[in-house]
């Protein structure tokens, strides 16, 4: 007699079977048959079936599915592979043997219902019997208790129809376990309450008896996993079209015992947890399986994932090779959406690697943008049309070629957002808008746009975009000297940083930069050195690598290592094509600082004139204002020319809402008044107010070195006017100056 498990269905049934139909999915929020099986494992653990020395693999197995972002494959095969080697407290039985028996003792929806009703008895505070519990009780705050409660709460919210659907999907999930244990066949013969003996293990007969059997999937697992992947792909500012988002979602929609999906989930899980080696290995296995299956349409998406992975871990050349393969594969397969996105991503990625490109590269970039604009419009892909306009904005800003082009493309991008009622690329748009106004010297408007974005898009924004917005706001508050607000914003950012591995590194790195800058300004060299060392523990992109070098140079200057600092600056400036214009200007300002400290005013003026020319041609108004104020401070300009210049700059400096810049303007104005005291004959009150305003501005930003410079200037002025009544004030200022007690 043929074994029930090995029986084949012959076409004698009057009901036609749909052998090629796609699998129907039954969506839940968290609960799946796999998590029901984990609940049964927790039951065994509570009854001390699992030996203490083997508890760690069991707990790792359960906790691997606690967080929806942990995208482990939800198959009984995985549980079997782990628990079949774990001996139980019952001799000659493995943990899986007892679990297998428990699984096959569930014959109806009522049996599953009883399971969920009884799970609360394993939690302290819920178990209300006066007798001592015959099993272990879990603390109500433990992760196992939380896992059980999440499963029970969702099950209790099922309608009757949903409960039946869940039972059907459980039968589908359990069926493959017939191959794991031969005694399971005999067990099913005796206990299964169906008229057809092999119904429990035969998928075809299950379909005949119950109709279409859905695969139970956790919508939270899929949605969160897809969302995190989309955030990583949009890291360089290129928004994904809707059809690509749907494709990424569909890659996770197939049956969970599908090896392709299993390796794909493992790849994503390793990637998001920061395990580069394991993620590459799982992605290679995914490549192998899709090449030997009928899913070759997914090949360009696998290559796209490879490019994102390599870029995320700093392997830039490998990322460019992978994205070029993606472009070729997408072109061959006719996937216009993937092709255009890959081209846009490559353009943006190359721009981030070569901040000041050569003319030949600029010409090539122009061709890519023209191709993207033409293709996205022809294919009616509004999200990519928007991306092209935003890329044009960034290119105009980098080149400093056309402010009209900047605002023209911003307007077109916003019109597309409104016309299509799709705001997928809106974080990128808002970030560009606030950065443009900041560059133009209108910090108040920049902060307004940041606040609007955070207020209205906090729930639908990608985690990285929202975190970057909070970090930008913290930097703006630091410029205003509002350090209590900085601490508040960083506390909010810390909560957001827990959403992914990349967010955690971004938050930790930027927070360190903020307090490193403050420590250098305070001349707190011990803390600054410690912060600089701590930066080695974070992942860096090209910009953060440069900033680390910049702060190291600032620390050298603060310590008095001027020769070492000037050598480091010249070395960085040897390859200007690798530096953004703003980075070059920051290095040039450091050279000006060194020249002023060593009283080489002619060289300082030469550098400042070049800074002013570069800042003006690239619409970097804050750098322009700072350069002009510093030029006035050095005192090489004609007295009245310098005063007229400062008078004309003050309104723009106030609009910039930048305290160090405003303090510098007051400092320069006071210095001119004191230097030309006989010629200008300013009132004593006017000069002292200028000096005090400069001191207050520097104090708010913890700039100790500049405070000392202004206090020294004030002492010089008070001595110069030679008023005996001011002698106590002079002694007071001298005492503060020499005691370094300038922050009180």
From Swiss-Prot:
GO cellular component: anaphase-promoting complex; nucleus
Key words, A-Z: Cell cycle, Cell division, Mitosis, Ubl conjugation pathway
Entry protein name: Anaphase-promoting complex subunit 5
Metal-binding recorded as keyword: no
Biological process terms in GO annotation: anaphase-promoting complex-dependent catabolic process; cell division; mitotic sister chromatid separation; positive regulation of mitotic metaphase/anaphase transition; protein K11-linked ubiquitination
PANTHER family in the cross-refs: ANAPHASE-PROMOTING COMPLEX SUBUNIT 5 (PTHR12830:SF9)
Record function comment: Component of the anaphase promoting complex/cyclosome (APC/C), a cell cycle-regulated E3 ubiquitin-protein ligase complex that controls progression through mitosis and the G1 phase of the cell cycle. The APC/C is thought to confer substrate specificity and, in the presence of ubiquitin-conjugating E2 enzymes, it catalyzes the formation of protein-ubiquitin conjugates that are subsequently degraded by the 26S proteasome.
Record note on quaternary structure: The APC/C is composed of at least 13 subunits: apc1, apc2, nuc2, apc4, apc5, cut9, apc8, apc10, apc11, hcn1, apc13, apc14 and apc15.
Top-level taxon in the UniProt lineage: Eukaryota
Family label: Belongs to the APC5 family.
């Amino acid at each position: 007699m043929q074994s029930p498990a090995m029986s084949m269905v012959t076409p004698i049934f009057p009901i036609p079977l749909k052998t090629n139909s796609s699998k129907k999915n039954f969506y839940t929020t968290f609960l799946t048959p796999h998590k029901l099986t984990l609940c049964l494992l927790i039951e065994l653990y509570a009854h001390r079936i699992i030996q203490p020395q083997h508890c760690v693999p069991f707990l790792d197995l359960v906790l691997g599915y606690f967080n929806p972002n942990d995208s482990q494959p939800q198959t009984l095969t995985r549980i079997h592979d782990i628990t079949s080697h774990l001996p139980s407290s019952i001799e000659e039985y493995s943990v899986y043997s007892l679990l297998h028996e428990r699984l096959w003792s569930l014959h109806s929806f009522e049996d599953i219902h009883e399971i969920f009703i009884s799970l609360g008895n394993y939690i302290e505070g819920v178990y209300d019997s006066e007798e001592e519990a015959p099993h272990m009780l879990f603390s109500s705050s433990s992760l196992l208790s939380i896992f059980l409660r999440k499963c029970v709460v969702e099950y209790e919210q099922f309608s009757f129809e949903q409960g039946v659907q869940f039972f059907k999907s459980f039968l589908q999930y359990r069926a493959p376990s017939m191959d794991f244990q031969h005694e399971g066949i005999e067990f099913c013969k005796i206990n299964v309450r169906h008229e057809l003996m092999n119904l429990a293990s035969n998928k075809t007969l299950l379909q005949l008896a119950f109709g279409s059997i859905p695969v139970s999937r956790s919508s939270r697992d899929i949605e969160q996993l897809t969302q995190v992947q989309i955030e990583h792909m949009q890291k360089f500012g290129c928004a994904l079209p809707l059809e690509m988002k749907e494709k990424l979602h569909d890659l996770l929609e197939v049956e969970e015992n599908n090896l392709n999906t299993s390796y794909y989930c493992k790849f994503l899980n390793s990637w998001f947890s920061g395990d580069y080696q394991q993620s590459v290995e799982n992605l290679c296995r995914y490549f192998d399986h899709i090449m030997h299956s009928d899913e070759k349409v997914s090949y360009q998406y696998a290559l796209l994932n490879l490019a994102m992975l390599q870029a995320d871990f700093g392997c830039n050349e490998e990322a460019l090779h992978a994205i070029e393969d993606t472009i070729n594969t997408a072109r061959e397969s006719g996937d216009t959406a993937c092709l255009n996105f890959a081209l846009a991503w490559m353009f943006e990625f190359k721009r981030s690697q070569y901040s000041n490109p050569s003319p030949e590269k600029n010409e090539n970039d122009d061709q890519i943008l023209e191709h993207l604009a033409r293709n996205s419009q022809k294919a009616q892909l509004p999200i990519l049309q928007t991306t092209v306009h935003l890329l044009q904005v960034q290119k105009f800003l980098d080149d400093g070629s056309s402010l009209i082009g900047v605002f023209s493309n911003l307007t077109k991008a916003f019109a597309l957002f409104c016309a299509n009622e799709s705001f997928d690329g809106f974080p990128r748009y808002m970030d560009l808008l606030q950065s443009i106004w900041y560059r133009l010297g209108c910090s108040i408007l920049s902060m307004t746009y940041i606040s609007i974005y955070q207020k209205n898009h906090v729930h639908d924004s990608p985690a990285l975009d929202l975190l970057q917005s909070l970090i930008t706001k913290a930097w703006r508050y630091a410029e205003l000297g509002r350090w209590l607000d900085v601490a508040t914003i960083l506390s909010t950012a810390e909560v957001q940083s827990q959403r992914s591995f990349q967010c955690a590194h971004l938050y930790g790195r930027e927070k360190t930069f903020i307090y490193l800058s403050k420590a250098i300004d305070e001349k707190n060299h011990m803390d600054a050195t410690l912060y600089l060392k701590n930066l080695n523990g974070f992942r860096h992109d090209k910009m953060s690598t440069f900033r680390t070098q910049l702060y190291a140079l600032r620390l050298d200057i603060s310590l008095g290592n001027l020769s070492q600092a000037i050598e480091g600056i010249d070395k960085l400036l040897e390859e200007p094509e690798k530096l953004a214009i703003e980075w070059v200007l920051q290095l040039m300002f450091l050279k000006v600082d060194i020249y002023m400290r060593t009283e080489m005013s002619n060289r300082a003026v030469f550098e400042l004139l070049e800074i002013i020319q570069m800042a003006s041609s690239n619409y970097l108004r804050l750098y322009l204002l700072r350069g002009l104020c510093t030029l006035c401070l050095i005192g090489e300009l004609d007295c009245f020319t310098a005063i007229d210049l400062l008078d004309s700059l003050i309104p723009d400096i106030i609009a910039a809402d930048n305290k160090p810049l405003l303090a510098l303007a007051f400092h320069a104005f006071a210095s001119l008044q004191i230097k030309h005291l006989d010629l200008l004959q300013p009132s004593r009150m006017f000069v002292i107010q200028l000096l005090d305003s400069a001191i207050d501005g520097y104090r708010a930003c913890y700039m100790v070195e500049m405070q000392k410079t202004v206090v020294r200037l004030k002492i010089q002025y008070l001595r110069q006017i030679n008023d005996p009544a001011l002698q106590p004030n002079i002694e007071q200022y001298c005492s503060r100056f020499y005691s370094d007690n300038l922050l009180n």
